[in-house]
Amino acid sequence: MSNKNSIEGILLNKIPFKEKNVIGHVLLRNGHKVSVVFYGGQGGGKRHIGSTLQLGYLISFLASGTHKSSFEMLGSNEYKEKWHHEAITTNVKAYYLMCFFIECLEKFSPLATNAHDLSENSNEQVGLFRLLSNAIFRLEKVCHEKSYETGTELGLFLTKAMIELGVFPNSRICEVSGNILKDSDLAYLSAEKGGFVLEQFLEAEDKRLIDRTMSSKIGLHSRLEKISRSQYAEVKNIEFSLNECRELFKFICYQQHMSPSDFKTYTALI
């Protein structure tokens, strides 16, 4: 397959189409997603060839034309895997987490609607591809090393997602009082207030939601600040409880005008 005109991206989902084909959403390197009909993508045949089209795989394909002038769907007879995960599929919890990562990007990434959106020179949304590729690559690594922890990987992903989506909260100041936050301060990430609020300025219900065990080590705001200054693969020795992950995801959904219940894979994690 020629590399000159090939398109690369991560497979987000796939459904069988007719007898041998597959329709899949692909997150391109530029952060846009596109629907593709992969002819013969189900594999099989006389030689029982397995399909190379698996969720989370990085694939390269040649577009054989458009089915619609709006670029809502492409067709491809030529495609191959460029990178694949192995260890993730041996860990059920990690696989569910990868599916959640993928569903998030399925919902957050814009659909390609013109030729410019297919070009790698279109880089307005490139951070979305970087987010998913880094998350899956790290997930594969920790599964291989037998060091997987759901809270850590989920919290890291959600923190990086806030950055790429442009909704990262001010982690240094209380949104109600304006006080500077110290590392040891108990603060709650309030979706309604748009940032962190010190415990003494919270309603009773929100005070109950603070994870005091985790925050007694280092506040959630401080961990987010540390992650924001680090490369995805370089983040170490940072933990998140599942309660804190709920806090982060609720914040993202509120800013994106969504609800956690909109995500089918979320209930398998929390």
Feature locations, PLM:
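Non-catalytic alpha-helical scaffolds and adjoining flexible linkers that form interface surfaces
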Residues: 1-22, 27-270
